[in-house]
Design a protein with these regions (language model features):
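PLP-dependent enzyme catalytic core of the Aspartate aminotransferase-like
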Residues: 2, 336, 340-415
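Conserved PLP-binding catalytic core of the aspartate aminotransferase-like
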Residues: 291-322
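A glycine-/small-polar-enriched, mobile loop at the entrance of the PLP active site in fold-type I
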Residues: 4-61, 65
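Active-site phosphate-binding strand-loop segment of PLP-dependent enzymes
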Residues: 115-171, 184, 192
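Conserved beta-loop-alpha segment that forms the PLP phosphate-binding cup at the N-terminus of a helix
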Residues: 55-83, 87, 91-95
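Conserved active-site segment immediately N-terminal to the catalytic lysine
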Residues: 178-190
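Active-site C-terminal subdomain of aminotransferase-like
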Residues: 14-15, 190-283, 287
Length: 415
């Protein structure tokens, strides 16, 4: 009998053994020379993962929501106009946060399963000057993938800051912060970054830092104020001790370990691995006669899949049966559709074998509940899609990404 269940929700995810080992190491002082080196190295590695050699990184004890709050607290003042581009629950959350800081907020909400067109965004940007716009790269509630690159270009065109909520995308989806002109890219530690919950991570452009420095009013939120955190980040990068609030020492040791694993794999290869696995997994889901929330594969996230329950199948019963097969997936999050769909995470060190286990558990549960499908169909479809991808890659230029997806990356050692 298996002693634990495979955690396949959209965060927290399954973590590398090396990361968990680092988390369990003896806690040192936050001004110990060894820890100062770890913190400084983590800040440097963030620039590599974010593709932002010019950015200012922040590592703060907190959640992804704190990272969102920090961006708003430091860049938005009362009366500023903010445009929120929403594809689900977390777009609306950014509106709530901006409203708390006195912003005049306009929200563009995409129809369920769709994204906002660039034409609609530009039309709104023409109506008045927006100080900032927010983009949810992957909305964890819907599995919708937005394309931040052209939106960031529009923001630059209209002298507007661009803030990317990358909570469910950083280290899983393609992001080139400096090249694309994104001003803030933020995330939490527990998703594709691959570290247990507890760290808010941000990368801030020189432009955004200058806007912050030229604020007319003090930052209202004491804990989120970059005035308190910037000297700490700079000190650690210079390998000097510093203190504002005690950092979560073990989490940061785990973060350095995970960032090294990510950088060893390589961002290009890591993103491609996520894309290949997600495409095959969606094909497997489709073969089970399940409809995903994203209406096209082009806007479907590569870090999670959101799909509707089949007609006549009780969601709670299905999730329980899957859990009895030692796999944990998540229910819905959108309040108006919470009981109508489920979500499966496939990010970080996820492997082929993980997704085979998920499809097998899902397929068995559906069959037990009377869903009319062919036994083994999802596994066959998934495997065939992977083999097709591998053959295509081999023919083009080699198969490094394909080798990565077949490795169980949770057993990779990094010096």
């Amino acid at each position: 009998m298996k002693g634990r269940k495979l955690l396949m929700i959209p965060g927290p995810i399954e973590f590398e053994p090396n990361v968990l080992q680092a988390l369990g190491s003896a806690t040192t002082s936050h001004v110990d020379p060894n820890f100062i080196e770890v913190f400084g190295k983590s800040l440097e590695l963030m620039r590599e993962v974010w593709r932002s050699p010019k950015g200012q990184p922040f590592i703060v004890s907190g959640t992804g929501t704190l990272a969102m709050d920090m961006a708003a607290a430091n860049l938005i003042e009362e009366g500023d106009s903010v445009l929120v581009i929403s594809t689900g629950y977390f777009g609306k959350r950014f509106k709530d946060i901006a409203d708390r800081y006195g912003a005049n907020t306009t929200i563009l909400e995409a129809p369920l399963g769709e994204v906002i067109s660039l034409q609609r965004i530009e039309k709104e940007l023409k109506t008045k000057h927006y100080k900032a716009l927010t983009i949810t790269h992957v909305d964890t509630s819907t599995g919708i993938l937005a394309d931040p690159k052209p939106i960031a270009k529009l923001a630059q065109k209209y002298n507007t800051l661009s803030i990317l909520d990358g909570v469910c995308s950083v280290a899983g989806e393609e992001i080139k912060q400096d090249q694309w002109g994104l001003d803030v890219v933020l995330t939490g530690s527990q998703k594709a970054i691959g570290v247990p919950p507890g760290l808010a991570l941000l990368m801030v452009s020189k432009t955004a830092m200058e806007v912050w420095r030229n604020r007319k009013t003090p930052v209202f939120n004491y804990y989120s104020d970059w005035n308190n955190w910037l000297p700490i980040m700079r000190a650690y990068e210079e390998r000097k001790p510093a203190y504002f609030g005690t950092p979560p020492v073990n989490l940061i040791v785990a973060l350095e370990t995970s960032l090294k694993i990510i950088c060893k794999e390589g961002m290009r290869e890591r993103v491609k691995r996520h894309q290949i696995l997600a495409k095959a997994f969606r094909a497997g889901i489709s073969s089970l006669k399940l409809e995903t929330i994203p209406k096209t594969n082009k806007i479907a996230a590569n870090t999670l899949t959101a799909a509707y329950y089949p007609e006549g199948i009780d969601g709670a019963t299905l999730l329980t049966k899957i859990a009895n097969n030692n796999v944990i997936i998540a229910g819905g999050l959108l309040p108006e559709l919470k009981t109508s769909y489920f979500r499966i995470g496939h990010m970080g060190s996820v492997s082929v074998n993980d997704l085979i286990a998920v499809l097998g558990a899902l397929e068995r549960a559906l069959l037990e509940l009377g869903h009319n499908i062919v036994p083994g169909k999802s596994l066959e479809t998934f495997q065939n899609e992977l083999l097709t991808s591998k053959q295509s890659k081999n023919e083009k230029r080699g198969s490094k990404e394909m080798n990565n997806i077949y490795d169980n990356n949770r057993f990779v050692n990094v010096d």
